[in-house]
Swiss-Prot record:
Homodimer. Catalyzes the oxidative decarboxylation of isocitrate to 2-oxoglutarate and carbon dioxide with the concomitant reduction of NADP(+). This is Isocitrate dehydrogenase [NADP]. NADP(+) binds at T94, H344, G345, T346, A347, P348, K349, Y350, N357, Y396, R400. Belongs to the isocitrate and isopropylmalate dehydrogenases family. It catalyses: D-threo-isocitrate + NADP(+) = 2-oxoglutarate + CO2 + NADPH. The gene is icd. It comes from Staphylococcus aureus (strain Mu50 / ATCC 700699). D-threo-isocitrate binds at S103, N105, R109, R119, R143. It is an enzyme of class 1 (oxidoreductase).
């Protein structure tokens, strides 16, 4: 078997039996969790395919290790390698201290145009949770990754640049509602039709491919009408224009109410649900954040903008055990580029202690295996995590909240996962 690159074809990824996959080990606890995760992934692939498939890992540098080795936090060689090999896995990266140095995670997303942050959130039986019915949480978040307030277009208070922006807004655009112009910083919030459409397209296609029931567009369009309000409308328009016979939208529902009455609209939606159509609906963000606590079962796939998505992803993760068990991926569904990553931070005080939970990067690697079409290996890891947690053999973060738990180290938890692969 010869190791080869993954390539992008007209029908999606072309995945060889021995793909070369770059990895960034990460800072802080990164080496601990990656050592554990890579053993679990390799064991699952071996068990699923009896040696007919395997991954050749290729380390690339970013973060502290890159800086110590090359003097750069994110070397161009790393970006070029990920661009060439399409798929990568990464541990947590620290953002270097100092003005003018942007987040390495954001830099990777922007350089590779990874427009979707994919965050599936579900509960594993036995995981400690602060809510009464964590089993009702089963959502997949599609967070737009390149626009919104997180685009990084900001101007610091008191600078020449911000004075120019404020002067332009006041004198050229007639803005009168900058309350304290002399001491304001300014951030720009770009939200585009193209950026919205590619995100919503990916979310609806995911819902279709994975037999999901609905896609909720989450926004604050009631206040920010020309950015978040446009996101909602562009999302609905895209759903009908590209997926018309596979979806039923709330805007269609409202039109039927207006023309034929609510009973007719309810009947139309019920018929669409029986036919297996995806229900496209929307929710104002603050109401949505209440509903994920009070009735989470009503939401399935979620498509939202960058800032909303950041809040929603971590709020949902808290309901099912925290970001220590929350997977994430950053994907460009058009070019095939994707980075699968731990969603938590570097936790430097635990670095090298062989103590922390490696589940986030392991489950992110499960997403990677699913993305590659290696579902058998992905399922083996997921089942093993379920069985291992159910047996109460867990790392300290869960053990301290579970009665009768056996606390184990990072590496011992990986050993247990490998033992429980079926």
């Amino acid at each position: 078997m010869t190791a080869e690159k993954i390539t992008q074809g007209t029908e999606g990824l072309n995945v060889p039996n021995e793909p070369i996959i770059p990895f960034i080990i990460g800072d802080g606890i990164g080496p601990d969790i990656w050592k554990a995760a890579s053993r679990v992934i390799d064991a699952a692939v071996e068990k699923a395919y009896n040696g007919e498939k395997r991954i050749e890992w290729k380390e690339v540098l970013a973060g502290q290790k890159a800086f110590d080795t090359t003097g750069e936090w994110l070397p161009q060689e790393t970006l070029d390698t990920i661009k060439e090999y399409l798929i990568a896995v990464k541990g947590p990266l620290t953002t270097p201290i100092g003005g003018g140095i942007r987040s390495l995670n954001v830099a990777l997303r922007q350089e590779l145009d990874l427009f979707t942050c994919l965050r599936p959130v579900r509960w594993f039986k036995g995981v400690p949770s602060p809510v009464k019915r964590p089993q009702d949480v089963d959502m997949v978040i599609f967070r737009e990754n390149t626009e919104d307030i997180y685009a990084g277009i900001e101007f610091k208070e008191g600078t020449t640049e911000v004075k120019k922006v404020i002067d332009f807004l006041q004198n050229e655009m007639g803005a009168t509602n900058i309350r304290f112009p002399e001491t304001s910083g300014i951030g720009i919030k770009p939200v585009s039709k193209e950026g919205t459409e590619r995100l919503v397209r990916a979310a609806i296609q995911y819902a279709i491919d994975n037999n999901r029931k609905s896609v909720t567009l989450v926004h604050k369009g009631n206040i920010m009408k020309f950015t978040e309000g446009s996101f909602k409308q562009w999302g609905y328009d895209l759903a009908l224009s590209e997926f018309g016979d596979q979806v039923f939208t709330w805007q269609q529902y409202d039109e039927i109410v207006e023309n034929e009455g609510r009973d007719a609209a309810n009947a139309a939606q019920e018929k669409a649900e029986k036919e297996g159509k995806i229900i496209i609906k929307d929710s104002i963000a603050d109401i949505f954040l209440q509903q994920i606590l009070t009735r989470p079962a009503e939401h399935d796939v979620v498509a939202t903008m960058n800032l909303n998505g950041d809040y929603i992803s971590d709020a949902l993760a808290a309901q099912v055990g925290g970001i220590g068990i929350a997977p994430g991926a950053n994907i460009n569904y058009e070019t095939g580029h994707a980075i699968f990553e731990a969603t938590h931070g570097t936790a430097p005080k635990y670095a090298g202690l062989n103590k922390v939970n490696p589940s986030s990067v392991i489950l992110s690697s499960v997403l990677m295996l699913e993305h590659l079409g290696w579902q058998e290996a992905a399922d083996k890891i997921t089942d093993s995590i379920e069985d291992t947690i159910a047996s109460k053999v867990v790392t300290y973060d869960f053990a301290r909240l579970m009665d009768g738990a056996e606390e184990v180290s990072t590496s011992a938890f990986a050993d247990e996962l490998i033992k429980n692969l079926k």
